[in-house]
């Protein structure tokens, strides 16, 4: 299956769990926030007194500024950022705080400068590199990763590859994200990173490897919805429907905090259909119709899926019911939409479960519908004539009776195709077959040998060695 580009963002949102950063406890920041929220008239004075206790500690001064930033008091946040830089110009903390303030004020240029200053001030501190990379990840993923590669030179122990993978993934550069994820052991990844890795592989249509990564993730986090989802998706694409169904059951019934999406319903339904479990598939599609988070246009398509499933189990009444819902949901009609009803009746002719008497009624209905389609859509007249010619041969009647019903439509098809100046080789072959059927009709039904030979002559003009035409022309 080729996944359309416009679906990538939606699929990524559905599959991958959000990254949750681990935040270290900052006691100074928490203490200052408590003071600021107290409503005391002298709250700023209290903070100032506290800050004097560590006036030469850049990290703690920056923590005071972080508290002001959290309260959106940008002027005081800037004040403590400057104090942190003054206390120790070789510490990255004051510059990082200044960069974060600039980000909050939508000043990307100043933010970039401050984070770069942090890198220069303390090359071993990863936070300046990381904040710069995060800020640049959308505008210039390559610059972001270049900063991380510079960090690698300073801190070989730091998980640069994982961060780079996440940056490229967020930027939609799946191949580069995969390259960086490939460098990291699964054991060194958190659950959301394993999920993101497998998701990028899935969206790149590397279903085997995506399944392998998702399976490893599932073994570590068996109730993680993302891994059950990815196992269902990948196994469905690989047509291992039994495994896909098992994963689908876990996703729907044995996953923590699973938010079921339209993609989940769709893939689970596909897997059930692939395993010929049409009634179960109908049940899933019915759930999809009731789901609040499924869009109206998606629900419209589900009606067609349900109709197809009912057709597979020979429940044509239900198939027509849902097919009509599907058709009625389209504001404009079309040949293909209207033909789908005729096709539904035509399909009953080749279904062994359809009683002979019902086949006759279905044939008459299908033939009438195709006749109306031919009148309404003259550009499709040849197609319609050919369909009407083929249907009688599925009826439980003798060959002459079949030919009596089919013959006029073969003649109509042949007349249309013969007048076509730019026939393809395939169409010419269809024309010859129609002519041969017409000769049989004239010989065995109409008892008109002259007409049969006239048609046979036309065949010889196209195909001089045609044995059927030669045989007709040799008759006395």
Locations of regions flagged by a protein language model:
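Low-complexity, intrinsically disordered Gly/Pro/Thr-rich segments
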Residues: 452-458
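Alpha-solenoid helical repeat scaffolds
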Residues: 7, 11-12, 16-446, 471-476
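Bacterial N-terminal signal peptides that target proteins for export
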Residues: 1-7
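Eukaryotic acidic, Ser/Thr-rich intrinsically disordered low-complexity regions
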Residues: 459-476
């Amino acid at each position: 299956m080729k996944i359309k580009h416009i679906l990538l963002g939606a699929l990524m949102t559905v599959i991958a769990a959000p990254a949750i950063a681990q935040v270290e406890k900052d006691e100074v920041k928490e203490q200052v926030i408590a003071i600021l929220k107290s409503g005391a008239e002298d709250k700023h004075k209290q903070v100032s007194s506290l800050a004097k206790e560590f006036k030469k500690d850049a990290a703690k001064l920056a923590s005071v500024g972080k508290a002001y930033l959290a309260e959106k008091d940008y002027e005081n946040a800037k004040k403590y950022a400057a104090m942190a830089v003054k206390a120790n110009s070789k510490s990255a903390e004051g510059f990082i705080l200044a960069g974060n303030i600039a980000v909050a004020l939508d000043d990307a240029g100043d933010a970039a400068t401050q984070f770069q200053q942090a890198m220069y001030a303390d090359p071993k501190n990863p936070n300046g590199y990381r904040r710069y990379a995060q800020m640049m990840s959308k505008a210039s993923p390559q610059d972001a990763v270049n900063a991380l590669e510079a960090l690698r030179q300073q801190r070989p122990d730091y998980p640069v590859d994982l961060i780079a993978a996440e940056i490229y993934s967020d930027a939609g550069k799946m191949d580069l994200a995969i390259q960086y994820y490939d460098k990291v052991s699964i054991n060194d990844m958190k659950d959301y990173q394993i999920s993101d890795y497998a998701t990028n592989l899935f969206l790149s249509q590397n279903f085997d490897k995506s399944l392998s990564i998702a399976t490893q993730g599932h073994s570590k986090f068996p109730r993680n919805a993302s891994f059950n989802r990815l196992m269902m998706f990948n196994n469905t694409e690989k047509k291992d429907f039994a495994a896909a169904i098992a994963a689908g059951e876990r996703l729907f019934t044995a996953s923590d905090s699973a938010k079921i999406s339209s993609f989940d319903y769709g893939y689970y339904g596909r897997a059930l259909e692939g395993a010929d479990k049409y009634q179960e598939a109908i049940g899933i599609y019915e759930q999809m119709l009731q789901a609040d988070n499924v869009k109206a246009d998606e629900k419209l398509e589900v009606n067609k899926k349900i109709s197809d499933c009912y057709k597979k189990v020979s429940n044509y009444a239900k198939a027509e019911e849902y097919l009509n819902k599907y058709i009625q949901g389209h504001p404009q009609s079309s040949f293909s939409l209207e033909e789908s009803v005729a096709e539904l009746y035509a399909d009953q002719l080749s279904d062994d479960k359809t009683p002979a008497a019902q086949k006759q009624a279905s044939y008459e209905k299908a033939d009438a519908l195709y006749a109306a389609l031919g009148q309404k859509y003259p550009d499709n007249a040849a197609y319609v004539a050919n369909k009407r010619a083929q249907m009688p041969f599925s009826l439980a009647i003798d060959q002459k009776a079949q030919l009596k019903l089919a013959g006029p439509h073969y003649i109509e098809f042949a007349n249309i195709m013969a007048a076509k100046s730019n026939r393809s080789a395939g169409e010419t072959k269809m024309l010859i077959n129609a002519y041969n059927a017409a000769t049989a009709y004239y010989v065995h039904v109409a008892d008109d040998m002259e007409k049969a030979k006239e048609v046979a002559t036309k065949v010889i003009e196209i195909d001089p060695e045609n044995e059927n035409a030669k045989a007709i022309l040799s008759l006395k």
